Amino acid sequence: MFVIEAVKSDVDANIQHKINQKTKPLGALGQLESLALQIARVQYRGDKQSLSTPLQITKPTMLVFAADHGIAAYGVSIAPSEVTTQMVHNFVQGGAAINVFCRQVGFELEIIDCGILQPLTGQANVIDQRLGAGTKAMHLAAAMPLEKVAQGFEFARQLVARHIDVGCNLIALGEMGIGNTSAATAVMSAMLNIDVEQCVGRGTGIDDATLVIKTKLINQALDLHQHELVSPEAILAHVGGFEIVQMTGAILAAAEQKILVVIDGFIATAAALVAVKLSPQSRDYLVFAHESQEQGHKLLLQQLQATPLLSLGLRLGEGTGAALALPLIQAAVNFYNQMASFDDAGVNNVV
């Protein structure tokens, strides 16, 4: 499994003092200050002399995990499962929102096939980490065998290690999969032991009648498996998705290696919830990009004591919110590294 250390807090006062001594009123950079503190804590390696080392973001990488869901065949979405493969093809061609935003902000983009129904053939730039051809319909059977969760975690560990080996110290998580808001809703409901109705949202933009069907089937799934939902891994196996499994594994793998993870929207945050339940220490490494319009996302963020960087009304997924957050993360790094202190600038200290 994953061995994750909490970030060291013994130098928090030193880091905060450095932030406070920048040429600004106390706290005037708002959330960027807490973000800089978090990044500095993550990148601190135990030697107090290293506090003078500039923070840095190197080779930031967006990982988009794609998979299909058996429940999608039962009327929970306005889009058929074929759209998953079509959108993965769009990613490969560079035409999706995530491609545009990654190019704009400087993210390397990698697409991972975790188990779409119709895999693309001959695409070297789609990473094959397939756990199957879509999950089973979770209201009729377990979404996947338990061993697929362990396999997905190992795939994710290897993926993250490969990027760290070439100098990446920040990953962001996105996803694509018709039906995955249903899986994320079920995971959230089971993990937090709260009603589906508090978690479920409109996903691709479903109408009221479809929302009723979606809610009913998720409740059926949770009722069917209620005696088996005994651990985070079991919850993933019975009502999760292949991409949610691998995002969870990627979070844990990145935290184990002490690098930052930028969490996108509702689906990625559901994976973050599972990761934090498995390893509370992993929470230290997570930056939450935005609050989406999915009903359950705000509650998920509250449960994780997360203040997102953005609130733009997004509900696209793909990692789009995480991509848009990268300039803010870089801004936090840059002010920490480059902004003058009161002493340096010869400015009266107003702190």
Swiss-Prot record:
| Class of enzymatic activity (EC top level) | transferase
Q: Which reaction does it catalyse?
A: 5,6-dimethylbenzimidazole + nicotinate beta-D-ribonucleotide = alpha-ribazole 5'-phosphate + nicotinate + H(+)
Gene Ontology biological process = cobalamin biosynthetic process
Q: Name one GO molecular function term.
A: nicotinate-nucleotide-dimethylbenzimidazole phosphoribosyltransferase activity
- EC number(s) per entry: 2.4.2.21
Q: Which residues form the active site?
A: E318 (proton acceptor)
Gene3D superfamilies recorded for this chain?
A: 1.10.1610.10, 3.40.50.10210
One Pfam annotation, family name? DBI_PRT
What keywords would UniProt list here? Cobalamin biosynthesis, Glycosyltransferase, Transferase
Pathway involvement? Answer: Nucleoside biosynthesis; alpha-ribazole biosynthesis; alpha-ribazole from 5,6-dimethylbenzimidazole: step 1/2
- Sorted alphabetically, which NCBIfam families does this protein's record hold? cobT_DBIPRT, PRK00105.1
Q: Which family does it belong to?
A: Belongs to the CobT family.
Q: What does this protein do, in the record's words?
A: Catalyzes the synthesis of alpha-ribazole-5'-phosphate from nicotinate mononucleotide (NAMN) and 5,6-dimethylbenzimidazole (DMB).
- In its UniProt entry, what is this protein called? Nicotinate-nucleotide--dimethylbenzimidazole phosphoribosyltransferase
The species this protein belongs to is: Shewanella frigidimarina (strain NCIMB 400)
